[in-house]
């Protein structure tokens, strides 16, 4: 019976405190105890009209008690006390679920990465696998799964609500933690059910000498009797269980043959050691423990940041893999479509060769076909060259960005070393000297006003301060008054600078909003282009189908009306010519779009170069400032 303060389900005040020494020190416990570590704190009486039960709902002398895990008609919804929106807790739950599935032989491949954001199909498969341990004949229903799963969890006694809408998007960041909590609860239920099946809960008589203490049977029986007695009194309204605690402690000591004298001597020795530790702590001048705790908190914070960054990288990697898979599927579909067009062209060529034309007509058609093929081949080469050029420009742009980010990181590291970063640093004076990876058009102007000019002003102020302090050494009293006056002036300057920083932050936020609107605009244009592409493909397929129908009609009437067949064949040739003309126009439009993208990349490259030059200038300025500061 483990009472964990970090997972209390009741929102009422605690009735007991942990001031009493745990019985773990008095009994030789095993680590694999099915009921957890024994901890019976000294109860402290408090008045409470409404108490919470974990197993049901009853009415006692103290008033009505509510059940946390299932009720007999209550309709109020409970709030989940687990930190399901904490990334560290969610990762821990995912790891537990992964280990459980692997240990129990989950069919199919499962990874921790797949459990970060599973699909609805994977969730249903995991749920069915875990539920089969409770009911081996269970089969997942085929209809209205989003209604059946919350109902089954409620029937099992799951105390928290799982909405039907969350079942439609089970892998979303706001719904997956709730579903994960339900799976963890179901997994714990399976473990508890399996533990109860492995051991016999119908205990024999306590005085039976054939009991095996190695199997913990007698100890588990004592635990169950103690829980039953205390729970009955609790449901009757009692808040203290001193008699039950004493009786339980006596039986445990009798069961394990505890030496009272040895226990008493160990307690006295523990008290003496605690007094000695307190005396040493009072006598010590520096508390190294506080420093170590501070360092531990700092390291834990850094570890959490690294874990968050790793999760972000994994999510980015997953997105790139999904995008690559989508592009591969799209490429395969285009290749299949191209193969179909080639077969159709071969069939039409065969039909065309079997038809009766004059040598002049055949020569003219072949000449036009060769010209169109050469045009298409040239345009295809131009398109490939344009795509390769765009790819090279993107690679160069990414390399330039990486170099700029390295220099920015070096600058920020130097600023932290000089205590200029962050905003609350010792030498920042209310300025934000940190450079962030932002490539907007107003970034350079903002950094000049926010970083370069304040740094120059700080250098001038440092030089003036050094000269002033050299002269101030002549008179100590005048120095004190002058320093006080300067402090007052600096406070006013800091207030003004903070106001300026607030205005600059507001301008930055407006610029970010404009960038977001620009991104939405580009996304809308991209959707429009995709729609145009689909419409064009639909028209092409429709034209091909019409051509096929016309060819079939011409074959049926070939021997009846030769002249009419020739006319329809000419119409087919005309339609194919129009189709090739539309294709050529589309290729010209694609080439024009590639040229526009190249111009845009050139502009971005120039902006990055300007940013790199400004960063080099700021780096030189900071190095000069360091040299002057060191010379002081």
Curated annotation (Swiss-Prot):
GO biological process assignments: attachment of mitotic spindle microtubules to kinetochore; cell division; chromosome segregation; metaphase chromosome alignment; mitotic sister chromatid biorientation; mitotic spindle organization; positive regulation of mitotic cell cycle spindle assembly checkpoint
Family the UniProt entry places it in: Belongs to the NDC80/HEC1 family.
Keyword Cell cycle applies: yes
Coiled coil, from the record: 263-419, 459-632
Pfam families to which the protein is assigned, alphabetical: DUF5595, Ndc80_HEC, NDC80_loop
Protein name as catalogued: Kinetochore protein NDC80 homolog
The protein's role, per its UniProt record: Acts as a component of the essential kinetochore-associated NDC80 complex, which is required for chromosome segregation and spindle checkpoint activity. Required for kinetochore integrity and the organization of stable microtubule binding sites in the outer plate of the kinetochore. The NDC80 complex synergistically enhances the affinity of the SKA1 complex for microtubules and may allow the NDC80 complex to track depolymerizing microtubules. May play a role in chromosome congression and may be essential for the end-on attachment of the kinetochores to spindle microtubules.
Subunit structure: Component of the NDC80 complex, which is composed of ndc80, cdca1, spbc24 and spbc25.
């Amino acid at each position: 019976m483990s009472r964990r303060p970090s997972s209390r389900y009741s929102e009422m005040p605690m009735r007991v405190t942990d001031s009493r020494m745990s019985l773990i020190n008095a009994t030789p416990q095993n680590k694999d105890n099915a009921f957890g570590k024994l901890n019976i704190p000294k109860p402290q009486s408090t008045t409470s009209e409404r108490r919470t039960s974990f197993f049901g709902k009853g009415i006692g002398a103290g008033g009505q008690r509510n059940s946390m895990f299932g009720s007999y008609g209550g309709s109020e919804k409970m709030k989940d006390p687990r930190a399901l929106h904490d990334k560290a807790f969610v990762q821990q739950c995912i790891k537990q679920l992964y280990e459980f599935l692997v240990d129990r032989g989950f069919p199919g491949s499962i990874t921790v990465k797949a459990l970060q954001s599973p699909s609805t199909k994977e969730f249903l498969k995991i749920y069915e696998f875990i539920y089969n341990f409770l009911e081996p004949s269970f089969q997942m229903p085929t209809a209205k799964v989003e209604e059946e799963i919350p109902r089954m969890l409620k029937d099992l006694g799951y105390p928290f609500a799982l909405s039907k809408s969350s079942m439609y998007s089970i892998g979303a960041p706001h719904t997956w933690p709730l579903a994960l909590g339900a799976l963890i609860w179901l997994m714990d239920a399976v473990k508890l059910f399996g533990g109860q099946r492995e051991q016999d809960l119908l205990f024999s008589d306590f005085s039976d000498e054939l009991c095996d203490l190695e199997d913990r049977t007698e100890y588990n029986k004592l635990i169950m009797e103690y829980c039953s007695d205390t729970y009955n009194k609790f449901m009757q309204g009692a808040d203290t269980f001193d008699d039950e605690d004493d009786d339980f402690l006596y039986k445990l000591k009798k069961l394990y043959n505890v030496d009272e004298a040895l226990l008493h001597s160990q307690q006295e020795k523990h008290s003496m050691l605690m007094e000695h530790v307190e005396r040493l702590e009072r006598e010590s001048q520096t508390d190294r423990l506080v420093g170590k705790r501070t360092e531990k908190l700092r390291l834990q914070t850094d570890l959490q940041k690294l874990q968050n960054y790793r999760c972000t990288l994994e999510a980015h990697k997953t997105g790139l893999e999904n995008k690559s898979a989508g592009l591969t599927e799209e490429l395969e579909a285009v290749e299949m479509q191209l193969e179909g067009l080639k077969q159709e062209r071969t069939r039409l060529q065969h039909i065309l060769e079997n038809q009766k034309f004059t040598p002049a007509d055949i020569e003219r058609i072949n000449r036009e076909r060769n010209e169109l093929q050469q045009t298409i081949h040239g345009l295809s080469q131009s398109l490939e060259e344009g795509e390769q050029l765009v790819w090279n420009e993107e690679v160069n742009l990414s390399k330039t960005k990486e170099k700029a980010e390295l220099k920015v990181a070096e600058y920020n590291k130097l600023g932290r070393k000089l205590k200029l970063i962050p905003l609350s640093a010792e030498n920042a004076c209310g300025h934000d000297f940190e450079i962030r990876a932002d490539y907007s058009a107003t970034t350079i102007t903002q950094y000049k006003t926010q970083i370069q000019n304040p740094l120059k002003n700080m250098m001038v102020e440092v030089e003036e301060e050094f000269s002033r302090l050299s002269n101030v050494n002549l008179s100590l009293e005048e120095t004190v008054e002058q320093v006080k006056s300067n402090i007052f002036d600096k406070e006013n300057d800091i207030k003004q600078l903070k106001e300026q920083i607030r205005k600059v932050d507001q301008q930055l936020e407006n610029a970010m909003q404009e960038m977001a609107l620009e991104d939405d605009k580009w996304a809308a244009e991209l959707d429009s282009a995709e729609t145009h592409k689909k419409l064009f493909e639909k028209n092409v397929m429709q034209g091909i189908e019409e051509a096929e129908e016309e060819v079939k009609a011409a074959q049926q009437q070939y021997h009846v009306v030769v002249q009419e067949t020739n006319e329809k064949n000419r119409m087919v040739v005309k339609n194919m010519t129009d189709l090739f003309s539309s294709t050529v126009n589309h290729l010209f439009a694609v080439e024009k779009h590639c040229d526009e993208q190249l111009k845009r990349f050139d502009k971005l490259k120039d902006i990055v170069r300007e940013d790199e030059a400004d960063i080099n200038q700021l780096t030189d300025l900071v190095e000069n400032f360091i040299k002057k500061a060191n010379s002081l």
